[in-house]
Amino acid sequence: MSATTATKTGNKYVIDFHSMEKSSILGKTSTGEGASFNGDRIYCGLVTKKKGTGSKAHFHPDETFNYVLKGALKVHMDGMDFVVPTGCLFHIPANMVHIAVATEEGDATYLVWRDRVAEKQGKPITTEA
């Protein structure tokens, strides 16, 4: 955790994503930007994708959950197209190829959680499909 986060909250167990430096979350695989934190076993991030932008087809070796806080995500996964609206959780099974794009109506902000098993084994956490 950054010193800024610990100082602002005054508690090493309280993570303030809004005070953390923002960066690209998946590099060239996605337009998503935000702040993230690695626990011992779980990765967590607060991500924003600008309207109409998002990820290329990719997969993660570990199970992932995205909870949409604002806006909506258009998703293509498992041969289906669907929308994940505000207030809904999007579950991505391990190794499932997916694409997630903010709808044209506005930016999408979501919390992401992913286990870190593969990362701790030295495997890439994201692979383009």
Question: Residue spans of the language-model regions?
Answer:
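A short, N-terminal "cap"/entry segment at the start of jelly-roll beta-barrel domains
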Residues: 1-41, 46, 125-129
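Short histidine-centered beta-strand/loop micro-motifs
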Residues: 34-36, 54-60, 101-103
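Short acidic-glycine-tyrosine-enriched beta hairpin
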Residues: 79-94
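Ligand-binding loop in jelly-roll beta-barrel domains
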Residues: 94-120
